[in-house]
């Protein structure tokens, strides 16, 4: 007979994705996300990855506000929304983080900007770097890579390598930032595969 402690541990280790569902609100934005992703990334855009990112950011609530001030479906901070709109005025125009169409265009555009600045040993690892940067800033990713390399770790691998190194974040920010790519790529991406491709299928069972 299992002790309560062991039973609790085994229960905690069960795949959390079994209870995950796509929110009802997501369907109304599906077509807009697909169109925006194809426009920026082409027909091979990882739709499931983008959808999982929105799921993690706002659970598809266009009016979402975080305690620290992030706004809309893609949870842009005001300064980041203004910056990305200024960087791509033709594609994005005036920043409108609470406008679902603008938020989804801005998310896939910012992800592309980050993707172009992050190399990795696999596509899954590359997206983990991208998502870490989306959550905490590219500067932190660069510093974490340098620290990992100086410590003898592979700076081109995120999982079980760079993700272990903290170049100076607070404990809370570090924990949030490390959970962010894993939740999106290893937990939520798979529930959106009916929408399109993901990038981390080889790691779903790890």
Labelled PLM ranges:
Residues 2-12:
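Bacterial N-terminal signal peptides
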Residues 45-50, 55, 68-71, 127:
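Extracytoplasmic
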Residues 52, 75, 130-132:
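Soluble periplasmic/extracytoplasmic beta-strand elements of cell-envelope proteins
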Residues 3, 46, 165-167:
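N-terminal hydrophobic alpha-helix used for membrane targeting or insertion
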Residues 55-80, 137, 184:
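Cell-wall polysaccharide-cleaving catalytic domain and substrate-binding groove, primarily
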Residues 13-32, 41, 82-109, 113-206:
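Non-catalytic cell-wall polysaccharide-engagement segments
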Residues 38:
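A Zn2+-metalloprotease active-site environment signal
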């Amino acid at each position: 007979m299992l002790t309560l402690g062991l039973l609790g541990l085994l229960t905690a280790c069960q795949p959390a994705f079994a209870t995950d569902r796509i929110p009802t609100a997501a369907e109304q934005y599906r077509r807009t996300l697909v169109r925006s992703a194809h426009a920026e990334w082409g027909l091979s855009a990882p739709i499931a990855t983008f959808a999982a990112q929105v799921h993690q950011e706002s659970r598809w609530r266009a009016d979402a506000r975080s305690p620290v001030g992030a706004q809309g479906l893609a949870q842009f901070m005001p300064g980041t929304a203004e910056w990305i709109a200024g960087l791509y005025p033709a594609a994005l125009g005036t920043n409108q983080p609470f406008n679902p169409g603008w938020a989804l265009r801005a998310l896939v555009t910012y992800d592309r900007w980050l993707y172009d600045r992050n190399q990795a040993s696999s596509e899954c690892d590359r997206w983990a770097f991208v998502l870490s940067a989306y959550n905490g800033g590219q500067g932190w990713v660069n510093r974490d890579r340098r620290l990992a390399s100086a410590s003898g770790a592979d700076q081109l691998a995120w999982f079980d390598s760079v993700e272990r190194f903290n170049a100076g974040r607070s404990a809370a920010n570090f924990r949030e930032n490390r959970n962010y790519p894993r939740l999106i790529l290893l937990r939520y991406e798979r529930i959106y595969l009916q929408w399109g491709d993901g990038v981390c299928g080889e790691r779903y069972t790890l």
